[in-house]
Amino acid sequence: MRILLSNDDGVTAPGIQTLAAALREFAQVQVVAPNRNRSGSSNALTLESPLRSETLANGDISVIDGTPTDCVYLGVNALMRPRPDIVIAGINAGPNLGDDVIYSGTVAAAMEGRHLGFPALAVSLDGERHYDTAAAVTCRLLRMLSDAPLRSGRILNVNVPDVPLTAIRGWRVTRCGSRHPAQTVIHQQDPRGKPLMWIGPPGAKQDAGEETDFAAVAAGYISVTPLQVDLTAHGARGRLAEWLGRVDKGGAAW
C-alpha cells in the first residue's frame, strides 16, 4: 500500500511523525506537508505565486508556505511516484468535529485527495497527548479497508479520544454536530500602539445529540463521519424552484 500523508500542523508536528512511523511498519509512506502550521486554512490553494519544496533528511517533503491542499495536489501530481493508493491527513492536534470541518486544513487535505480520485481519511486527536492511540486506530482502520474495501466515494473524518488505547470504547458512525456562531475578537496593540485583533475560540456546542461526532468522542468512542465534496442541498432544490417561479413575476424578461 502506498500512502500520501499530509497535515495542517506542519511537517515536523508530533501527530504526523507518530502516524508516519506507525504506517511505515506495513506501507510505503510519503509525507508531503506544510513547512509551518497552517491550521484553519480550509481548502485554500496557492495560485498567485510559485511553490518550493524541500526534501528533509528523513525523506519527508516540506512545501514552503504551502497549504494542506497545495501539499496533496503537489504530492499526487508531482512529488510521489508512483502515485498513492490512498491519501491520509493527520494526526491533527485537536479535534475536527461538527462545523469545525469547514475550516479544517486536515479535512481539506483529505478532501483534496478525494477530489483527485483517491480514497481519503482525515484523522484528528481530541487533545495533544495520546498520538499513539490515534496512530493505532488509523492503522487498524487501514487494514480493515485493505481487507474489505469500502467503495463509498466519501471522505472518512475520524476523531479519536485523547486516552490510552485500552480506554477506547469502540467505533461510532456519526454525523457532524454544530456550534453556536463564534463572536469573540481579542483586541491588543503592537509596540507602536497600532491595533491588533485575534480571532477567538469557536462557539459553544449547539447540536451535540447522541448521533453526533461530539457525543461519540465525549463518550470515549472513535467517531467516523462520512463526508462528501458535493455541497448541494438536494432537498432544497424543489422548494427553491417553486419559490423562484412564484416570486419572479417578470419571468425571463430582463
From Swiss-Prot:
A divalent metal cation binds at D8, D9, S39, N92. It catalyses: a ribonucleoside 5'-phosphate + H2O = a ribonucleoside + phosphate; a ribonucleoside 3'-phosphate + H2O = a ribonucleoside + phosphate; [phosphate](n) + H2O = [phosphate](n-1) + phosphate + H(+). Its cofactor is a divalent metal cation. Disulfide bonds: none annotated. GO terms for cellular component: cytoplasm. It is an enzyme of class 3 (hydrolase). GO terms for molecular function: 3'-nucleotidase activity; 5'-nucleotidase activity; exopolyphosphatase activity; metal ion binding; nucleotide binding. The keyword Cell membrane does not apply. It is found in: Cytoplasm. Its EC number is 3.1.3.5, 3.1.3.6, 3.6.1.11. InterPro entries: SurE, SurE-like_Pase/nucleotidase, SurE-like_sf. Binds 1 divalent metal cation per subunit. Keywords: Cytoplasm, Hydrolase, Metal-binding, Nucleotide-binding. Belongs to the SurE nucleotidase family. HAMAP family: SurE (MF_00060). Nucleotidase with a broad substrate specificity as it can dephosphorylate various ribo- and deoxyribonucleoside 5'-monophosphates and ribonucleoside 3'-monophosphates with highest affinity to 3'-AMP. Also hydrolyzes polyphosphate (exopolyphosphatase activity) with the preference for short-chain-length substrates (P20-25). Might be involved in the regulation of dNTP and NTP pools, and in the turnover of 3'-mononucleotides produced by numerous intracellular RNases (T1, T2, and F) during the degradation of various RNAs. This is 5'/3'-nucleotidase SurE. It comes from Edwardsiella ictaluri (strain 93-146).
